Amino acid sequence: MEFHFDATFFAFVGLVLFLALVVYLKVPGMMARSLDDRADQIRNELAEAKRLREEAQHLLAEYQRKRKEAEAEAAHIVAAAEREAQMLTAEAKKKTEEFVANRTALSEQKIKQAEVEAMKAVRSAAVDLAIAAAETVLGKQADAKVQSELFGNAVGQVKTRLN
């Protein structure tokens, strides 16, 4: 058997030596370990991304719930403010009506009092005028004693009727 040492043979020997060197230096194990480490890193990153996504969804749901609660509370506050404004308006209207009614009653009372005082003044003036007229008529027609008697009686009657 004859061996030919041609280029193919040396290429084959170089390949075998290279593969032996690679196996001796444990390159396939290092590659497998490196790929496993990379796979673990990717798996951990995916798990972290999933956890962050779930946390973000949870926070989003919580913020949406809080927003709805805030909107409901704002609507409640607005409704309460509207009710209070209506109550204050009604109360102010009632107080204004009461004030106007009281002022009207007071004005009517003052008018009635003025009417009564005017009637008293007119009666007093009429009595004074009647007394003066009676004095004049009696002064011309009666003597002093009769005049004095009539005057006293008339004044007494006027006093009793006015009081």
UniProtKB/Swiss-Prot annotation:
Primary subcellular site in the record, as a coarse category: membrane
Protein name, as recorded: ATP synthase subunit b 1
GO terms for cellular component: plasma membrane; proton-transporting ATP synthase complex
Family of the protein in this entry: Belongs to the ATPase B chain family.
Keyword line: ATP synthesis, Cell inner membrane, Cell membrane, CF(0), Hydrogen ion transport, Ion transport, Membrane, Transmembrane, Transmembrane helix, Transport
Any matching Pfam family: ATP-synt_B
TM helices/strands, residue ranges: 5-25
GO molecular function list: proton-transporting ATP synthase activity, rotational mechanism; proton-transporting ATPase activity, rotational mechanism
Cell location: Cell inner membrane
InterPro entries per UniProt: ATP_synth_b/b'su_bac/chlpt (IPR002146), ATP_synthase_B_chain (IPR050059)
UniProt-listed PANTHER family: ATP SYNTHASE SUBUNIT B, ATP SYNTHASE SUBUNIT B', CHLOROPLASTIC
Membrane topology: Single-pass membrane protein
Quaternary structure (record): F-type ATPases have 2 components, F(1) - the catalytic core - and F(0) - the membrane proton channel. F(1) has five subunits: alpha(3), beta(3), gamma(1), delta(1), epsilon(1). F(0) has three main subunits: a(1), b(2) and c(10-14). The alpha and beta chains form an alternating ring which encloses part of the gamma chain. F(1) is attached to F(0) by a central stalk formed by the gamma and epsilon chains, while a peripheral stalk is formed by the delta and b chains.
CDD domains linked: ATP-synt_Fo_b
Transport among keywords: yes
Physiological role: F(1)F(0) ATP synthase produces ATP from ADP in the presence of a proton or sodium gradient. F-type ATPases consist of two structural domains, F(1) containing the extramembraneous catalytic core and F(0) containing the membrane proton channel, linked together by a central stalk and a peripheral stalk. During catalysis, ATP synthesis in the catalytic domain of F(1) is coupled via a rotary mechanism of the central stalk subunits to proton translocation. Component of the F(0) channel, it forms part of the peripheral stalk, linking F(1) to F(0).
